[in-house]
Amino acid sequence: MGGLGSAPLPPLGPEDHLLGADEDEPLIVYADYECPHCAVLHARLVRDGGSWAFRHFPVRSKHPRAWAAACAAEAAALQGAFRQMHMALYADRARLEDPHLWERARALGLDVERFDADRRSDAVLARVRRDFESGVRAGVVTTPTVFERGAMRPSAPDEM
């Protein structure tokens, strides 16, 4: 019988958000937009030009605004702007409340009414939940957690 961490890491699929350089075997990163360590890792990945798939792992007990931010990123994805929203959320982690999320959507040229409806939709909630649950099954307990070729790597940015 399986428990936490007993399932294999789900392989990359069409729902994954690939960021960075185009590589055959990108890292898989479970992260949270409010997590300071995730922000450090994100900056390092961007700076170093690596390739990674971003999966949502909002740790609500530590980061109460992370779930809303994850839903905002997925709502932007439905309008073809995941990467842009992802970058905007990490650029200003201190402002993850509704008015600021709407400002970001507007600045990205998104249909703000659709964005707001989408981020509260069952489909977006299910998408974020799928990422989170796949992380739990693969043994993720904190953020950031990085997998390389299916194996969990040290998560602290200075250990990578």
Name each model-derived stretch:
Residues M1, M85-M87, M152, M160:
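Detector for methionine-enriched segments
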Residues M1-L9:
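N-proximal helix/coil linker or "cap" segments that precede and/or mark the start of modular domains
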Residues L4, G20-E23, F57, A70, ...:
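Sparse, context-dependent recognition of short Cys/His-centered cofactor- or disulfide-binding micro-motifs
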Residues P8-L9, G80, H86, D118, ...:
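Homeobox/homeodomain signature
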Residues L18-L19, L96, R153:
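Short clusters of hydrophobic/aromatic residues that line enzyme substrate/ligand-binding pockets
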Residues D24-A31, H37, H42-R47, E103-M160:
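C-terminal cap of thioredoxin/glutaredoxin-like
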Residues E25-R106:
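Structural alpha/beta surface segment adjacent to cysteine/selenocysteine redox centers
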